[in-house]
Amino acid sequence: MPKKAGILLALTVLAMVVLGYHPGLEDDAYYLAAIKQRLNPALFPHDSDFFRLQFQATLFDRLIAGSVRLTHIRLEWAAFLWQFAAVFAILAACWRISRQWAGVALVAVLLSIPVSGTGISLVDQHLHPRALATACVLWAVAMTLERRFVFAGVLLAGAASVHAIMAAFGISCCLFLAFPEGVQGVAMLLPLGWVFDPASEAWRRAAATRSFYFPLRWEWYEWLGVLAPVAILWMFGRFGRRLAWFAIFQFVVAIAMMLPPGLERLRPLEPMRYLQLVYLLMFLLLGGLVGKSVWRWVVVFIPLCVGMTYAQVQMYPSSPHIEWPGTVPSNSWVKAFVWVRGNTPVDSYFALDPEYMAVPGEDFHGFRALAERSALADNLKDPGMVARVPRLADRWLAESEAQRGWKGFQAADFLRLKRAFGVDWVVVNNAAVTGLECPYRDGDLRVCRVE
């Protein structure tokens, strides 16, 4: 047991080194903000609906905030340790399923690989409820294979408490593994009365920003990533064929949900994300196959480690590959956000370029999560929340339209935002902006009052 734990610990360290760690990145703009508001309810007095409403159906933010209160560990370290624990639990579950270290090692180095047609990776570079749910689901798969169904049910309930959609995929997968003959023709039953409510034009504009909602727009290689796993899994005996049937069933369900225009409200359920579980189990099986030859394994494994690490470094070139908790940030945008957190009132209301996350050098760090201040809606991440919470659509559209032409804004435009929404601060990346008092400057990047 100590030897196995030591190997799992080493593989977890390897996985974290390859994956990297970036708090506040991408979806963590929501999750970290929600946890921080749970710890300090005074935060985000103007815009908490853009993350709070989704968290009504999950215990994730309560769980992480509760662990901080219980242990008195700083949140940045608590989030890092939860991420490490989630990766460890995923790899431990993979070992329990396959009993082959080669397969577990392959999964460890491929955690950052994109999943076709879904907009996600196997594991994110920050703490995400999907990672915790994935660990629970994989352990439920292991318990199902061992016919320990009560434990599997408890684990799936745990997954549902933090990420209901991942839990649904886990339930489906476990049913196919336990009772393949009895579920291949079973349809999914959901309370879908809300699906047929008419969608607003504002909601459609927000949903249109999510390319993975529209399968007919996918590239050929994305379709290859959807269909090839079925053929690969079919080669791995009874276990592989049961997983293939699971993949086929979920694919049919996903297409039935995503293609008909009348079911457009179902698209935010992201039914193609069942592929995350399929990819994990497929790589686990492939790793075991490659590992039967030591030399073949070395030839595959070492280049994969180097290549996957290099890809992650290049994906966020202006940030350290691992943004360690408690360290001084080197990314100029993150430094500005940290300054905002320490030097502006808690009830401040900010405006930024609505596409600031995609600005070169920003590296997709979320303002709310890192600055801990309210901000007008953006055009990159907030539309995804609008798609899930349609009542936000009109507000998002109004704020988005008000910020149209941001790159040419001057003091008069910012005063217009102040009159319309109450904005009293802006973050600008344009040295040509004049007429504002800007107490923070770092090159062209400035934090300015709107008075």
Roles of regions detected by a PLM:
Residues 132-151, 178:
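Membrane-interface transmembrane helices that cradle and orient dolichyl/undecaprenyl
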Residues 314-451:
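Extracytoplasmic
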Residues 70, 144, 158-166, 371:
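Transmembrane helix irregularities
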Residues 1-14:
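Start-transfer (signal-anchor) and selected internal transmembrane alpha helices
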Residues 13-91, 97, 101-110, 114-135, ...:
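Active-site lumenal/periplasmic loops and adjacent helix-entry segments of GT-C-fold
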Residues 16-32, 39-57, 164-170, 176-279:
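Transmembrane catalytic cores of multi-pass membrane glycosyltransferases
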Residues 4, 186, 291-316:
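Signature aromatic-anchored transmembrane alpha helix within multi-pass, membrane-resident enzymes
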Residues 81-89, 127-136, 167, 171, ...:
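Membrane-embedded alpha-helical segments of multi-pass membrane proteins
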